[in-house]
């Protein structure tokens, strides 16, 4: 199963690199999808010292989105959060915010894990980059690069904040009113 996931991740990454991955959006309520993804990880989480939380601001949040892309992005971010957290909390949040009079729908994945060093933080979305150190886990270094490519394809933004030994937070910002005229 792990090998299959790795192969799928590499194939998805290549599609984003060669512009063969197409954005396929439909208008809908994103809240149930986020809740469903969160419940999957809440049930799959085998680390008893991690409290997995789902925080959804409103039951109805309408926007155009690509369900497959959102799922792949969150699968990567949440599995990383669980992998790099021994104990504490992993939280998946969905909310709406305004910046410069523009409405955004934001998805946030935060953890109380090992965190990312200040030196590594600017490079985490680079292809094949892996932070070295005592908490390095097995991987290919394409997970976050794939996430970045998919969020960019979705015309969104992703950013990360982290403090070593305190945890990390990843923010995905999507324009709430984007109608994606060039999407399928």
Segments from the language model and where they lie:
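Short conserved segment of the HATPase_c
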Residues: 116-128
């Amino acid at each position: 199963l792990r090998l299959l996931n790795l192969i799928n991740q590499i194939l998805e990454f290549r599609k984003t690199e060669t512009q063969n991955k197409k954005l396929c959006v439909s208008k809908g309520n994103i809240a149930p999808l986020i809740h469903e993804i969160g419940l999957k990880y809440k049930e799959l989480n085998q680390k008893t010292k991690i409290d997995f939380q789902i925080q959804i601001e409103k039951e109805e949040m309408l926007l155009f989105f690509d369900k497959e892309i959102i799922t792949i992005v969150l699968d990567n971010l949440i599995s990383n959060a669980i992998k790099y957290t021994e104990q504490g909390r992993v939280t998946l949040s969905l909310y709406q915010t305004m910046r410069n009079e523009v409405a955004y729908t934001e998805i946030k994945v935060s953890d109380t894990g090992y965190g990312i060093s200040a030196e590594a933080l600017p490079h985490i979305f680079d292809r094949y980059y892996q932070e070295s150190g005592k908490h390095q886990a097995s991987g290919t270094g394409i997970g976050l690069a794939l996430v970045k490519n998919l969020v960019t394809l979705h015309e969104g933004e992703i950013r990360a904040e982290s403090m070593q030994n305190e945890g990390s937070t990843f923010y995905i910002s999507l324009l709430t009113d984007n109608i994606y005229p060039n999407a399928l």
